[in-house]
Swiss-Prot record:
HAMAP family: Leu_tRNA_synth_B (MF_00049_B). Belongs to the class-I aminoacyl-tRNA synthetase family. It comes from the Bacteria. It comes from Streptococcus pneumoniae (strain ATCC 700669 / Spain 23F-1). Its EC number is 6.1.1.4. A motif ('KMSKS' region) lies at residues 610-614. This is Leucine--tRNA ligase. GO terms for cellular component: cytosol. NCBIfam families: leuS_bact (TIGR00396). One of its GO terms (biological process) is leucyl-tRNA aminoacylation. It is found in: Cytoplasm. InterPro entries: aa-tRNA-synth_I_CS, aa-tRNA-synth_Ia, Leu-tRNA-ligase, Leu_tRNA-synth_edit, M/V/L/I-tRNA-synth_anticd-bd, Methionyl/Leucyl_tRNA_Synth, Rossmann-like_a/b/a_fold, tRNAsynth_Ia_anticodon-bd. It catalyses: tRNA(Leu) + L-leucine + ATP = L-leucyl-tRNA(Leu) + AMP + diphosphate. Keywords: Aminoacyl-tRNA synthetase, ATP-binding, Cytoplasm, Ligase, Nucleotide-binding, Protein biosynthesis.
Length: 833
């Protein structure tokens, strides 16, 4: 057979690995450890697409490489299986979300196994398994005991069609829900919150210790959003009311000409004049229909209403009209801002819109034309005049503190984590509300609080989840006869994914989240690979929970993930018409190398775009495995380009990778394998071992494969192949194409055992040194020949070889040699006349 028969070989070795538990996690305490983690998937009905295996292949290469280097390797996989999609599907079809999820998991697992990933399936976790979410609930009870889980009446992003509130991060820029694209409105509701803000400073500072890309760290820093400034208290004219504003620029107080409250601010109704009451009420209603993202969009038209009230500027006593505007959020800062229109563009636009005064307090711009937002010396600012920013801030803060109307303050953009969902398909929150007004956590001995099975999973629409309808589950009675009601909200999908990497370490422990010694052995995760779309939410939440567990003494490290790598996106093929509109692939035909719209005949431009069902350009890995084989898919996705780049899928590239594997197969199976080394491939082999080893370490898998190709080309020029080099090469390709490598290993090693734990090859540095070098021969300064000679020859030896060369002899025939200049390892110059 002269080609790689993937249909026969790949299932054979997948069966072998499963039967022999080849990838069971090592427990030899004398070995170093390596924990390679993938972001576990949500098991959707659509199954895997070709984007999933990119990251999975990367961690699999590292895991196979580290096993060969003698490491204990933990390489697990599991399922992030709670969440809205399964519940939405269940409501649409009448199916049980648990059954739907189980079917999807079985399909995902089949697809993953068909790709030859070396997961230890004994450590599989599923966030919907009560034995798993027992510990999710346990973590929640600990947060509750420490005051970090609390209830609050907060304005939430309510989605009527989903029957639930969603987090700010799940609202799209257009004001619709990420899931389903439904309208989002603001609605006050009783919600569970987690006090992530208590960890803001640690979450910020500890980023410096992590081997993550600066772009991801910056995204987290910006999300946490630390600001240093001052709280300033403004009294409301003619009343005993006052409100506080946080500002990073208290030095511009002399330029504050009006104040703006969030429409939801608690003072609004109390200070609104009777003349303005109707307009204020109308505006508050309109604001409630908008999401935070829409309200804070800098590009949107500025709207607002005057309350009829005035605030008193604490530094100059001037009256400042108090407005309400939807760009101020009650949930951010104090829900109030002091407007300095001369030096803030949004305030400037608002002032121009409503004809409010603009007072310059920093010199350097023309504030009639636009806000001046750079720094400058202070003007029109009484005792601050002539001062720079730093000096002015220090002086004004001292003044405010002396007057008792302000103080220095550090704030964070980060908000507490909205942790409850009004849905069925999630972890029940283990809290009981008693009729005497108290609430208690479900005792640890009664965990897990199991999600009851029901077919009635439609949201109540009242803000409670479907669990409110299940009386037998809902109502409880204490030993003293006091009646209670279970919490009906469930946890968000983020809950189970915030700690799953810990459970992999000890997945069958019934007594605790995980054994302390095992946690010490395996933490932190050595490399975590996944999409950059999780840069803020999942990673921030996981870091928060990890730090909390560190404070409890459960985990031994301050951070969960030492190294993070975000793979790029695999783009699909798409087509655009002359307007730039995307055209689905089933509407396109190819003629003479160009692409045309089947219906209109218009010639289309081919362009990469994100794979989507609507464009019909999603590539199913099942189809690729069937036609080309899993090893081809693995090699192709790693060879496409740098791992972190977004690159378009190419059928031609796939075929090229398949041809390469066929060449590898033929090289090993058709060459004569020598027991003795003839030295012909010394340099090529040792260069390949060195390069592939270093490139795997640095995740440059595309260049590692390119080097493997270089060796195949060199080896194909030889009639025979030294057996140790054949073995070493098979070991080098094994992390990339494990099925092919296992099969070829049997032909040269004849052990009958897997290649997985054979020691990784090493290189001989002395073999990397060139034995021969190329020198040039010049005659009267012009190059007439290039010769391969032994390295470090003397001048005399070089001269002798050059003069004996046939080409050189022909050039100097009949001429007198005046002089010969020899430069060892470089050139011979012959002067003739």
């Amino acid at each position: 057979m002269s080609f790689y028969n993937h249909k026969e070989i790949e299932p054979k070795w997948q069966g072998y690995w499963a039967e022999h538990h080849t990838f069971k996690t090592g427990t030899d305490a004398s070995k170093p450890k390596f924990y390679a983690l993938d972001m576990f998937p949500y098991p959707s009905g659509a199954g895997l697409h070709v984007g999933h295996p990119e990251g999975y292949t990367a961690t699999d290469i590292l895991s196979r490489y580290k096993r060969a280097q003698g490491y204990n390797v933990l390489h697990p996989m599991g399922w992030d299986a709670f969440g809205l999609p399964a519940e939405q599907y269940a409501m649409d079809t009448g199916n049980d979300p648990a059954e739907f999820t189980a079917e999807n998991i079985a399909n995902f697992k089949r697809q993953i196994n068909a790709l030859g990933f070396s997961y230890d399936w004994d450590r599989e976790v599923n966030t919907t398994d009560p034995n798993y979410y027992k510990w999710t609930q346990w973590i929640f009870t600990k947060l509750y005991e420490k005051g970090l889980a609390y209830e609050a009446e907060v304005p939430v992003n309510w989605v009527e069609e989903l029957g639930t509130a969603i987090a700010n991060e799940e609202v799209l820029p257009d004001g619709t829900s990420e899931r389903g694209g439904y309208p989002v409105v603001r609605k006050p509701m009783r919600q569970w919150m987690l006090k992530i803000t208590a960890y803001a400073e640690r979450l910020l500072n500890d980023l410096d210790e992590l081997d993550w890309s600066e772009s991801i760290k910056d995204m987290q820093r910006n999300w946490i959003g630390k600001s240093t400034g001052a709280n300033v208290t403004f009294k409301v004219k003619g009343t005993d009311k006052e409100f506080t504003v946080f500002t990073t620029r208290p030095d511009t107080l002399f330029g504050a000409t009006f104040t703006v409250l969030a429409p939801e601010h608690e003072l609004v109704d109390a200070i609104t004049s009777s003349e303005q009451a109707e307009a204020v009420a109308d505006y508050k209603h309109q604001a409630s229909l908008k999401s935070d993202l829409v309200r804070t969009d800098l590009a949107k038209e500025k709207t607002g209403v005057w309350t009829g009230a005035y605030a008193i500027n604490p530094v100059n006593g001037k009256e400042m009209p108090i407005w309400i505007a939807d760009y101020v959020l009650a949930s951010y800062g104090t829900g109030a801002v002091m407007a300095v229109p001369a030096h803030d563009q949004r305030d400037w636009e608002f002032a121009k819109q409503f004809d409010l005064p603009i007072v310059e307090v920093l010199e350097g711009g023309n504030v009639e034309e636009a806000a001046y937002t750079e720094d400058g010396l202070h003007v029109n600012s009484d005792f601050l005049d002539g001062l720079n920013k730093e000096d002015a801030i220090a002086k004004i803060v001292a003044c405010l503190e002396e007057k008792g109307c302000g103080q220095e303050k550090v704030t964070y953009r980060l908000r507490d984590w909205l942790f409850s969902r009004q849905r069925y398909w999630g972890e029940p929150i283990p809290i009981i509300h008693w009729e005497d007004g108290t609430s208690t956590a479900v005792p640890e001995t009664e965990l897990p609080l199991v999600l009851p099975v029901t077919k009635d999973i439609r949201p109540s629409g009242t803000g409670e989840s479907p669990l409110a309808n299940l009386t037998d589950w809902l109502e409880v009675t204490r030993e003293d006869g006091v009646k209670g009601r279970r919490e009906t909200n469930t946890m968000p999908q983020w809950a189970g994914s915030s700690w799953y990497y810990l459970r992999y370490i000890d997945p069958h422990n019934t007594e605790k989240l995980a054994d302390e010694d095992l946690l010490k052995q395996w933490l932190p995760v050595d490399i975590y690979v996944g999409g950059a779309e999780h840069a803020v939410l999942h990673l921030l939440y996981a870091r928060f929970w990890h730090k909390f567990l560190y404070d409890l003494g459960v985990v031994p490290t301050k951070e969960p993930f030492q190294k993070l790598f975000n793979q790029g996106m695999i783009l699909g093929t798409s087509y655009r018409d002359h307007r730039g509109a995307l055209v689905a692939t089933d509407k396109v035909e190819k003629r003479d190398g160009s692409f045309f719209h089947i219906e209109t005949g218009e010639e289309l431009e081919q362009a990469p775009a994100k794979m989507s069902k609507s464009l019909k350009n999603v590539v199913n890995p099942d189809d690729v495995v069937e036609q080309y084989g899993a090893d081809t898919l693995r090699v192709y996705e790693m060879f496409m380009g740098p791992l972190d780049a977004s690159i378009a899928w190419s059928e031609e590239g796939l075929e090229g990778s398949r041809k390469f594997l066929d060449r590898v197969y033929r090289l090993i199976t058709s060459k004569e394998i020598l027991a003795e080394n003839n030295g012909a491939l010394d340099k090529a082999y040792n260069e390949t071992v060195k390069a592939v080893t270093e490139q795997i370490e640095s995740l440059k898998f595309n260049t590692a494969i390119a080097q493997l190709m270089v060796f195949v080309n060199a080896a194909n020029k030889e009639d025979k192949l030294y057996v140790d080099y054949a073995k070493g090469f098979i070991q080098l390709i094994a992390p990339f194409a494990p099925h092919l490598a296992e099969e070829l290993w049997q032909t040269v090693a004849e052990t009958g055992e897997s290649i997985s734990y054979v020691a990784w090859p090493t290189w001989d540095e002395s073999k990397l040194v060139e034995d021969e070098i190329e020198i040039v021969v010049q005659i009267k300064g012009k190059v007439r020949a290039k010769l391969m000679v032994a390295k470090d020859l003397s001048r005399e030896e070089l001269q002798e070889i050059a003069l004996a060369d046939e080409k050189v002899k022909a050039e100097i025939d009949g001429k007198e040699i005046v002089k010969v200049i020899s430069v060892p390892n470089k050139l011979v110059n012959i002067v003739v006349k």
